Regions:
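Soluble catalytic domains of membrane acyltransferases
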Residues: 8-197, 201, 246-249, 257-265, ...
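Generic hydrophobic alpha-helical segments
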Residues: 25, 106-110, 206, 210, ...
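Short, structured interface segments
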Residues: 199-215
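Positively charged, polyanion-binding regions of nucleic-acid-associated proteins
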Residues: 212-238
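Helix-enriched interaction subdomains in cytosolic or periplasmic regions
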Residues: 1-7
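Short, amphipathic alpha-helical interaction segments positioned at domain boundaries
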Residues: 296-345
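Short capping segments at the starts of secondary-structure elements
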Residues: 231-246, 250-252
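Charge-rich, solvent-exposed alpha-helical interaction surfaces
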Residues: 205, 209, 224-225, 246, ...
Length: 350
């Protein structure tokens, strides 16, 4: 265990957890009971971020659930040949399952992890998002994976009840700054001897909790402003001052959400970082005083694969908060009002 902790600390330095990972509400992470950490699946290397959040929050060294063919398509990559990633994740405590042929025998080790007082990390099956949306169900999958199954099995057949919980984790990547925010949700529990309907209800409660804990950042707001200008055929050239004023007005209208502290502390700097990032993708052209958008490129929908984020970071960033009606309404309010459509932008916005 100590060797694994030291190894994970080294990995944390490589991935820059101290500088690039922000954990919110880490105090909610249970320290004295086993739990299942369930997180939205964003990138291939999500487990390292989830692990870092658990370590920072409570000093927990959770294991991982990973399918046995996770890196099958990457084995010819230079980085895979340089570092045997399968061996690397085993050092971190990975337990593998076969996605196409899951058996009780493969699931039993995860139940034993909980019964032994340890924890593990999992991601709802077949929901990895490539477009920025919180979940993308693919194939014939129509419901979230059953995290509650492991709680029910860990409690089953015991003389005394086992206190075990599911902890929702929500990862939000600010694509412009590279900062990851992981918000720890309130632990969810399953009543002992709960039936299948109660388990199913808990699984839906889990995905709702994950979805509600996305962090709102300046890059998403900037993306929304640009997208609405493109979608509604508004002016293609926007004043820098007016653009920043719209972003600030939208931010002030958002209440009851986790807000990126960098957006509050330095909104001009965060908006500028977002615009520079969008420029790299060819979506905007920047001058000292104005922003000129490329309407066709902003409205284009890239392939639903790993290139989506790079080809259209405007859509990707906006998709992160698309399920927040209050956030999208705030952006619409500041862009689609008569004063917001005036030449020069939104300097007069309240």
């Amino acid at each position: 265990m100590h060797a694994r902790a030291e190894f994970c600390t080294v990995i944390g330095h490589i991935w820059g957890w101290r500088k690039r990972l922000r954990v919110v509400h880490g105090e909610r992470c249970p320290r004295d009971m086993p739990c299942v950490f369930a997180q939205n699946h964003v990138f291939l290397l999500d487990p390292f971020v989830s692990f870092g959040a658990a370590m920072q929050s409570a000093g927990i060294l959770p294991r991982f659930m990973s399918r046995d063919d996770f890196f099958a398509e990457k084995k010819q990559s230079w980085w895979y040949r340089l570092v045997n990633v399968d061996e690397l994740i085993c050092q971190l405590g990975t337990l593998e399952i076969s996605r196409g042929n899951v058996s009780i025998g493969q699931l039993r080790p995860f139940v034993n992890v909980l019964r032994n007082g340890e924890s593990f990390i999992m991601y709802p099956g077949r929901t990895r998002s490539r477009s920025g949306l919180i979940f993308e169900y693919r194939g014939e999958v129509q419901e979230p994976g059953s995290a509650s199954f492991f709680l029910a099995q860990a409690q089953r057949g015991r003389e005394t009840d086992l206190d075990v919980a599911i902890v929702p984790l929500t990862r939000t990547r600010n694509v412009a700054t590279g900062i990851d925010t992981v918000l720890v949700g309130h632990p969810l529990r399953l009543a002992p001897r709960a039936g299948r309907e109660e388990q199913r209800a808990l699984d839906f409660q889990l995905v709702e909790a994950i979805a509600q804990n996305v962090t709102v950042n300046a890059t998403q707001l900037a993306a929304g402003i640009l997208y609405l200008h493109a979608l509604h055929g508004l002016e293609e050239s926007i004043g820098r001052g007016g653009f920043e004023a719209m972003a600030r007005a939208a931010l002030e209208r958002v209440n009851g959400r986790c807000i990126d502290p960098d957006a509050r502390a330095d909104l001009p700097g965060q908006v500028s970082a977002a615009l520079r990032h969008f420029r790299k993708a060819g979506l905007v052209a920047l001058s000292r005083d104005s922003i000129r958008l490329d309407r066709a490129k902003i409205l284009a929908t890239p392939p639903m694969d790993g290139t989506f984020r790079k080809l259209n970071p405007v859509k990707y960033s906006l998709n992160q908060v698309l399920h927040f009606a209050d956030v999208t309404q705030a952006i619409e309010d500041v862009v689609l009002t008569p004063r917001a459509q005036c030449a020069g932008g939104a300097e007069q916005l309240p």
